[in-house]
């Protein structure tokens, strides 16, 4: 179990985080948790009974807890796991919950999104990363931009809030790629304005994590990985100081343009809901 630290989430609810699985089935080129980097580690998934036991212990120790944040990537990995989530939280009607989901986990189980809402899922997080099909292919991000729209629309229409993660500054990324990502984020925002669910963004500059496919490509082509520096241009976002660091701009565009797209995509969160 994690150490149970209570935080106030952005809804103002008292929340505790748990982990129900380790390892990842996906192989994103930018991610240190990619399947190809962890061949000696099998995906480990806790049983439904184990998760229920931990939840009971949490509520016994902290009876005023209102929300559970599930940190792992694979909690909602297929239709069966969605059913399991609903069964777990049906036993704790006083709790709402939030968790990460991959687009492909829902695109094949789109009819189950309503079940998640009925099971008191408050918010889902999706790693969207890019709206450029060219860049999605380069970073091994499975699912298309159309899939992202389909899933996002279903989530929002069912009254579940959505947080989308975006990354700018991948190697060889151009202004055209930036624009496609911004347009995808904007389209989801427009959908949210007409639905019960709300949409917010969390935007990052690409970082070449050691050992990843993109890191190795950069080293091979340039021999240089830049050191960590504070990015003053994006430090304006309150509560994001731990994310306002960069390890160099590896895109095809200048820093000013890269920062411009990071900032305006992040600002979509501030627009009227």
Q: Can you name each region flagged by the protein language model?
A:
Residues 124, 164, 201-203:
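A structural signal for short, well-ordered beta-strand segments
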Residues 1-162, 170, 183:
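Radical SAM [4Fe-4S] cluster-binding motif and immediate context
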Residues 10, 176-273:
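C-terminal accessory regions of radical SAM enzymes
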Residues 103, 168, 207-209:
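Short, solvent-exposed coil/turn elements at secondary-structure transition points
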């Amino acid at each position: 179990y994690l150490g149970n630290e209570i935080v106030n989430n952005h809804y103002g609810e008292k929340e505790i985080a748990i982990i129900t699985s380790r390892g990842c089935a996906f192989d994103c080129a930018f991610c240190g948790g990619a399947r190809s980097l962890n061949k000696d580690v099998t995906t480990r998934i806790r049983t439904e009974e184990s998760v229920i036991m931990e939840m009971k212990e949490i509520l016994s120790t902290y009876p005023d807890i209102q929300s559970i944040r599930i940190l792992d990537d694979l909690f909602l990995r297929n239709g069966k796991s969605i059913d399991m989530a609903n069964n777990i939280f049906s036993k704790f009607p006083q709790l709402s919950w939030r968790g990460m989901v991959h687009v492909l986990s829902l695109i094949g189980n789109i009819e189950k999104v309503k079940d998640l809402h009925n099971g008191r899922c408050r918010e889902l997080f999706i790693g969207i990363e890019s709206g450029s099909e060219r860049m999605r292919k380069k970073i091994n991000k499975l699912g298309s931009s159309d899939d992202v729209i389909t899933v996002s629309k279903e989530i929002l229409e069912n009254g579940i809030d959505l947080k989308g993660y975006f990354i700018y500054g991948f190697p060889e990324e151009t202004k055209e790629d930036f624009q496609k990502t911004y347009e995808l984020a904007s389209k989801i925002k427009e959908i949210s304005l007409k639905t019960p669910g709300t949409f917010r963004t969390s935007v990052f500059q690409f970082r070449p994590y050691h050992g990843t496919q993109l890191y190795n490509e950069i080293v091979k082509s340039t021999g240089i990985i830049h050191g960590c520096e504070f990015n003053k241009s994006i430090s304006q976002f309150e509560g994001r100081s731990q994310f306002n660091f960069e390890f160099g701009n590896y895109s095809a565009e200048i820093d000013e343009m890269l920062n411009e797209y990071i900032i305006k995509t992040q600002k979509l969160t501030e627009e009227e809901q």
